[in-house]
Amino acid sequence: MAAAEFLVLLKRECETCRMVGPVLAGLKARARLTLWSQDDPAFPEQTGGALDDRSLEQSWKHKVEIVPTLIRLEGGREVARTEGWNRADWARLTGIENIGKDLPPSRPGCGSITMDPGMPERLALKFGDLKLASRPIEVGEMDDPHEVAYDRGWSDGLPVIPPTDLRIARMLAGTTRKPDEVIGLIPPNLAECTIEKVAVNAVMAGCRPEYFPVVLAAIEAALKPEFSMHGLLATLWFSGPVVIVNGPVTKRIGMNWAGNALGQGNRANATIGRALQLVIRNVGGGRPQEIDRSILGNPGKYTFCFAEDEADPDWVPLNVARGHARGTSTVTLFHGDGVHGVCDQRSRDPESLSRSLALTLWSVCHPKLAQWSHAILVLSPDHYDIYKQAGWGRGEIEAGLWQALKRPGRDLVRGASGVAEGIDPSHANELVDKFHPGGLLVVRAGASGGLFSAVIGGWTAQRRNSEVQVVSQEIGT
């Protein structure tokens, strides 16, 4: 068997490292010992100093998180390690009984410099396999990087975070996927997009690394052919992608499904949706007044992302209703317009409330057009309580709304009520549904305190229900 040798990584700044100096001197006299110091090669004095690891290459290579770290090597390969000072552990690794007998039985170590904020990413860029492929842009010392981003057309109109190598590396640490993996071709230019390019735009959007898997899932969902992202970009209508997030990830990354869930103020909500839009703009070339021909647009084309309220165990979340297992984290993408408020402070039974909500839902696109678009109904807690107290869950609510949304065709045909717009006269004797089957998505969000809910109208291309569909995607790692 090969003779054991030992490796110790330490720093002068750590009191525990200073304490074990005499122990290291004794170990060096009895065994082959290599010392690496993170901050001072003259330390420890008892051993005549150490090798210089101020670059932190050795500490990074050996994945040191705590100093001192004692590593036992056999045949040049690590077989065991211990962190900090623990007499029993050091005796076990070195085979020296009563090692450090004059020291306390144990003492915790200190944080390695490799774990300082930003340092893991710096070291990965310097010494690791992470090699960024993105072309670096030199910014002059007197130039404002935010203005450079505006000048180069990278911004959606709001300032972006400069995507430095360090920030990109930190974002990439939020996923297990390789930077050079191609996630797909981004419309409208069908430009090849790698995980790294998504990371660049997620940085610019202001995302934290823990949001990154959600961003990737949103991109993958948007690229599904049935979502028709290219068509959504080119439409004259108002719509843009709306991202609804379900599952444990919403709590883990601190998303908002409560007060102001559809508004500003939550970093995860705001930046996940913005990252999707920036990828479409900066990678795919989807810019307003170019391929994006929307007549008016809507503020949600900056970002439109929120989480569903899943606090009530009796409620079936949207992703479960769409076929995913409960407890799965997913994104659902909808082609949505702005928010239309619904006020009903008098209904106290589910039938009345359903009829009331249906009146507003009929206004989506036009009150006399049917099956032209889909819609999201965002039920507030107070409106949901009316349903819940009556024993209604998702199934009953959807069925009640579906029934309330039927109208006589004669009231909707062109020319009826003196309005030229309307459905084809051939449907005059039919009972007409407002939406295609599955065209109304019901979700829960918002705060208590007002009997208000919200309707988010959909893209008019959804009248071709077999070609343009709402899509979902599980969130990976």
Task: Outline where the language-model segments fall.
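Non-catalytic, surface beta->alpha helical segment in thiol-disulfide oxidoreductase systems
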Residues: 66, 71-109
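Iron-sulfur (Fe-S) cluster-binding modules
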Residues: 100-133, 140
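Thiol-based oxidoreductase modules, predominantly thioredoxin-like and allied folds used
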Residues: 30-55
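A short glycine-leucine-enriched loop at secondary-structure breakpoints
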Residues: 61-65
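Catalytic cores of nucleotide-enabled group-transfer and carboxylate-activating enzymes in metabolic
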Residues: 4, 27-29, 37-39, 70, ...
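Short active-site neighborhood of thiol/selenol oxidoreductases, capturing the structured segment around
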Residues: 2-24
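Non-transmembrane, aqueous-exposed alpha-helical and coiled segments at domain scale
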Residues: 124-477
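Structural motif
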Residues: 9-13, 36-39, 380-382, 445
